[in-house]
Amino acid sequence: MLKNSLLLFMLAFVMSASAMAQNSQRTLAFEEVKAIAQAAEERAKKDNWNVVIAIVDAGGHLLYLQRMDGVQIASIEVAQKKAKAAALYKRPTKVFEDGLKSGNQGLMLLPGVIASEGGVPIVHDGQVIGAVGVSGVTSAEDGIIANSAIDALK
């Protein structure tokens, strides 16, 4: 009886470990996060733009935040919200900005949506593994910086 119980326990353990391995998703390594942040900062400095850079994981949880000198305090929250929306909705926040401009007011009813360019998902093998959000200059300029940061991983 003890032998059968032990065998069943071991079988259950192996099967659950196998199931967990199948459901594992690639995450951003800290070195990648730093490379994304550095690329964003370099792109911003190229045009003398001071911004906030936020990087989140696939669940929208903050991994990195940087506020350059002279940026308005509100940009801290805006950058985080852009990154989170891009991660959770798996699309750039420019999609929401464009939708709102074309009259789709219903987008604003979606929780966590921010209709301002500058949030871009980080995609690896077709899966969103995080996102970057930038705020501090115009939304188009925020988008330029965010997209440049994503290009650092290619």
Segments from the language model and where they lie:
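Bacterial N-terminal signal peptides
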Residues: 5-17
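Flexible, solvent-exposed loop/hinge segments and secondary-structure transition points
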Residues: 20-154
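N-terminal secretory signal peptides that target proteins for export/translocation
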Residues: 1-2
